[in-house]
Amino acid sequence: MILLVSPKDVAEAYEAIEGGADIIDVKNPPEGSLGANFPWVIKETREATPEGMLVSAAIGDVPYKPGTVTLAALGATVSGADYIKVGLYGTRSYQEALDVMKNVTKAVKDAGENKIVVAAGYADAYRVGAVDPLVIPKVARDAGCDVAMLDTAVKDGKTLFDHMDLDLLREFVEETHKYGMKCALAGSIKIEEIPMLKEIGCDIVGVRGAACTQGDRNAGRIQKDLVKEIVKVCRD
């Protein structure tokens, strides 16, 4: 299982790189779970990241505005991101989510056929009125995405496992694999929960808080020693 770590600036990105993260995922925590950072931060992070190491960019907890979201996705793509992560926050149904992701996929793949598109739903979708997390694999498949992902929308200390049990998460992983895609799971994941994600076949685990001082995604800073500990658990 590979590790995605989400820095908010280049200094944190260096810590994640030195700690051994596999994917450097640029985000902006004050703007939400999948808060979008600025194009120049993505560009600077890409320049700071070793060649061959992939850079991801979250483009926001997005509304149901396909044109707006598509432009954001293209902005992240041309800024140097290899993975484009879309948080399907304002989409209320399969059809709305599909509408957003089909257009994002078209824009991203037209700009770079090797770019990777991630459709991200929320395990706690019921708290914010977002699309059912269990339809995300179908949305991703039908939109031509590469990865189906789950995160949590509300960052209040509850983790992925507070909203979906292991059986439901296993169902999500297995359906995603059945459709020939990779599966990514995140959501205030604690280091001791990572072995359970490995057990159900998760391909990519995403963290920020667990790699930050005081375990605080907002006030804390990513530290390479914390990243190293998480990498070790992912590799064991």
Curated annotation (Swiss-Prot):
Pfam families: 4HFCP_synth (PF04476). GO terms for molecular function: carbon-carbon lyase activity. The active site is at residues 27, 85. Pathway: Cofactor biosynthesis; methanofuran biosynthesis. Its EC number is 4.2.3.153. GO terms for biological process: methanofuran biosynthetic process. Keywords: Lyase, Schiff base. It catalyses: 2 D-glyceraldehyde 3-phosphate = 4-(hydroxymethyl)-2-furancarboxaldehyde phosphate + phosphate + 2 H2O. Catalyzes the formation of 4-(hydroxymethyl)-2-furancarboxaldehyde phosphate (4-HFC-P) from two molecules of glyceraldehyde-3-P (GA-3-P). Belongs to the MfnB family. This is (5-formylfuran-3-yl)methyl phosphate synthase. It comes from Methanococcus maripaludis (strain DSM 14266 / JCM 13030 / NBRC 101832 / S2 / LL).
